[in-house]
Swiss-Prot record:
One of the Pfam families matching this protein, by short name: AAA_26
Pathway the protein takes part in: Metabolic intermediate biosynthesis; acetyl-CoA biosynthesis; acetyl-CoA from acetate: step 2/2
Native source species: Acinetobacter baylyi (strain ATCC 33305 / BD413 / ADP1)
Protein name per Swiss-Prot or TrEMBL: Phosphate acetyltransferase
Region: Phosphate acetyltransferase, residue numbers: 389-720
Gene: pta
A cellular component term, taken from the record's GO annotations: cytoplasm
Location relative to the cell: Cytoplasm
């Protein structure tokens, strides 16, 4: 068992972010990492942030810390050893479930003067490797080195085998472009050149800092973007009352502006992410905020100060903007005091802000040295495909595939942002079907930076060239006039581009129905030669493993032959994404314990699938618990190689599949990726109309990998 104790050198070093980033880096490498904070420094009834965020982000087992009050009492009574024994007991309770435990040390402050001494004793008690977590300034290496030196001697100094390295957080003095926020862990962001240069400067004051004796395991830049609170978070800070909360939980404050002059001189401040602060009597500011919102500019919110809240008649006049989610707060504080309180607002991540925590976690993990990480882990640990590792592999495979993906909903804001992310990070070459000026307008309103090589095609300029090919593809089922009319739909137009091999895949559905996305694919792309139907799978990202669920979106009631085909398609999809498939054909009974048409269908489908693909590990009928829970599987199907170990679940009908997928997703708080369509000649994928930007990015990545998989399959078929 490996234990790494994270020791902060002071307040404000980003200790929570450091712990979560290290856990995520381990998780992406298939190492199951747990978290422990033995000693609480929170007040009674306060929730520990790191513990809570770890539980949310990794669905990990947590234990209650020893209360701050109890720590003080024990130390006052001279019972330090007993306190450490209790910490060891808690550690052993958690450690049984993990390969590595990340332990958060005490924060040295004026109240807890004993923190550093107790941290040193804790390191010995847990036999832990120590990582110092500190801020840094590349322009002031002397101060940085002295701060590290001052803490090292408590842990045996540089020569101690216990000291594993230093993680520099919130590093000042680095170029602004080094603070990119990745979609998943991205080792290419690690600042190797900057670390080498900084190490040389540090070694003028401490010859071991930045060497193999005391390595710098990460130089994490300061990021303004990651320090931004939600509009929701400021209400208590400014003693505000909500006039309209709107989208305050989702909007973030990138900047704040105090409006004091005439409105015509302040209009340039009404931009995406801006928090507008103004006296309540300034109805012109309220109206300008409403107009900006109506024009598609997502302001962070509006804070009205002093006196009474605005007249209800004025608010009624602004109803259109209010319905679009504009958050509006009122505070009795004056304007200057409001602005000052916001300026003094801390960088801590609230326990319920999992979106920001996820971004910070990915950001920090990308700057951690994976070679150092691997050197700290016992060689006997068996890597697993965790959700983090799956998403990381997803992005890396799509980058390697270098595919062209067309996005028919080209001016839809989430799609534009997803395309910009994919293009800038090399996930795919994205093609937006939309008027270029419309895309530019969306990007400007939303603060999206469009990459220079992002391709935007005006549908009106290319439609006519697809009329004749479309008539030919439909084999006389429509004439040129009908083809021209159907091509007004950009989904049909994008599907024609795919049919003619001008792109490698298509993603749609942010504003279109599933039928709108899938129907043109059935008509123009058709099924692959080996298949008679199209089905779908969801990748279910459970805490310890990735499951594949099929079919949960397309086929209402497949017969035995079709069910066997869905199983084979799903197994091949699993393989394409690095999952070694163990396929369970799900039914309400296991083996021969039940009877009836539904059970017989599943049994027959299992036999057909085994005959067609003897290379696959398939079993059924199996109940869900017999397929997924090892103890139940051993009891109900002791001779099965799949029972209790299944990772691909094939449901007998759409009702069962869709219900199970949604129940697992909601009740277990499981992230899902999909649906991914399978069985088509070329990849087409449908989005949920409530899809987030990250959902669209991952679907684009899925589509790119599918395109590469199909290309490899065709090449293999030709070779044989």
């Amino acid at each position: 068992m490996n234990t790494i104790l994270m020791i902060p050198t002071g307040e404000g070093v980003g200790l929570t972010s450091a712990c979560l980033g290290l856990i995520y880096a381990l998780d992406c490498n298939g190492i199951k990492a747990g978290f422990l904070k033995p000693f609480s420094q929170e007040l009674p009834n306060q929730v520990d942030r790191t513990t809570s965020l770890f539980s949310h982000l990794f669905q990990g087992k947590t234990v209650t810390s020893i209360s701050h009050e109890k720590v003080l009492q024990r130390l006052a009574l001279g019972e330090r050893d007993e306190l450490l024994e209790e910490a060891v007991s808690i550690h052993r309770n958690v450690a049984a479930n993990y390969d590595v435990i990340i332990v958060e040390g005490l924060l040295p402050n004026a109240q807890d003067h004993f923190a550093t001494e107790l941290n040193a004793a804790l390191a010995q008690a847990l036999d832990a490797k120590v990582v110092l977590v500190s801020t840094a300034d590349v322009q002031n290496p002397r101060r940085t080195a002295e701060k590290i030196e001052a803490h090292l001697h408590h842990f045996g100094g540089v020569s101690s085998n216990r000291t594993a390295g230093v993680l520099f957080m919130r590093t000042r003095g680095l170029p602004e472009e080094t603070a990119q926020i990745p979609l998943t862990i991205d080792p290419s962001l690690r600042l190797n050149t900057e670390i080498a240069a900084f190490s040389q400067e540090l070694q003028r004051y401490n010859r071991n800092l930045g060497t193999t004796t005391l390595p710098i395991i990460g130089l994490v830049p300061f990021s303004n973007t990651l320090s931004v609170p939600r509009t929701l978070d400021i209400a208590s800070i400014i003693e505000g009352d909500w006039i309209h909360q709107g989208e305050a939980r989702h909007r973030r404050i990138l900047h704040s502006s105090l409006i004091a002059s005439s409105i015509e001189y302040e209009l340039n401040k009404f931009v995406a992410g801006e928090l507008i602060i103004s006296a309540s009597e300034r109805t012109d500011v309220l109206l300008a905020s409403s107009l900006a919102t109506s024009n598609g500019i997502p302001l962070a919110g509006l804070v009205l100060t002093e006196r009474k809240a605005p007249n209800p008649q004025i608010l009624d006049f602004c109803q259109h903007a209010i319905k679009q989610g504009l958050p509006i707060l009122h505070t009795q504080l004056n304007t200057l005091e409001t602005a000052q309180r916001l300026a003094d607002f801390g960088n801590e991540i609230p326990v319920d802000d999992t979106e920001r925590a996820e971004q910070v976690t990915r950001f920090v993990s990308s700057h951690i040295d994976t070679a150092w990480l691997n050197s700290q882990i016992n060689t006997g640990v068996q890597p697993r495909l965790s959700p983090s590792a799956f998403r990381h592999e997803l992005v890396q495979k799509s980058i390697a595939a270098k595919k062209r993906i067309v996005l028919p909903e080209g001016d839809e804001p989430r799609t534009v942002q997803a395309a910009a992310i994919c293009q800038s990070r090399g996930i795919a070459h994205c093609i937006l079907l939309a008027k270029p000026e419309a895309v530019v307008e969306v990007a400007k309103a939303r603060g999206i930076e469009l990459p220079d090589d992002l391709e935007i095609i005006d549908p009106d300029l290319i439609r006519n060239q697809y009329i004749t090919p479309m008539v030919e593809l439909r084999n006389g089922k429509l004439n040129e006039l009908q083809a021209k009319e159907q091509l007004q739909d950009t989904v049909v137009l994008g599907t024609m581009m795919l049919a003619l091999d001008q792109v490698d895949g298509l993603v749609s559905g942010a504003i279109h129905t599933t039928a709108n996305t899938v129907r043109p694919a059935f008509q123009l792309i058709k099924t692959a030669p080996d298949y008679s139907l199209v089905s779908s799978v969801f990748f279910m990202l459970l805490p310890d493993e990735v499951y594949v669920y099929g079919d949960c979106a397309i086929n209402p009631d497949p017969d035995a032959d079709q069910l066997a085909e869905i199983a084979i398609q799903s197994a091949d999809s699993a393989k394409a994404f690095g999952i070694n498939p163990r396929i369970a054909m799900i039914s309400y009974s296991t083996g021969t314990s039940g009877a009836g048409a539904d059970v017989e269908k599943v049994a027959k489908a299992t036999e057909i699938a085994k005959q067609r693909r003897p290379d696959l590990l398939i079993d059924g009928p199996l109940q869900y618990d017999a397929a997924s829970v090892e103890s139940v599987g051993r009891q109900k199907a002791p001779d099965s190689q799949v029972a209790g170990r299944a990772n691909v679940f094939i449901f007998p009908d759409l009702n069962t599949g869709n219900t199970t997928y949604k129940a697992v997703q909601r009740s277990a708080n499981v992230v899902s990726v999909g649906p991914m369509l399978q069985g088509l000649n070329k990849p087409v994928n449908d989005l949920s109309r409530g899809a987030l930007v990250d959902d669209i990015v991952f679907t684009i990545a899925l589509t790119a990998i599918q395109a590469e998989q199909q290309l490899e399959a065709k090449a293999a078929a030709l070779a044989s």
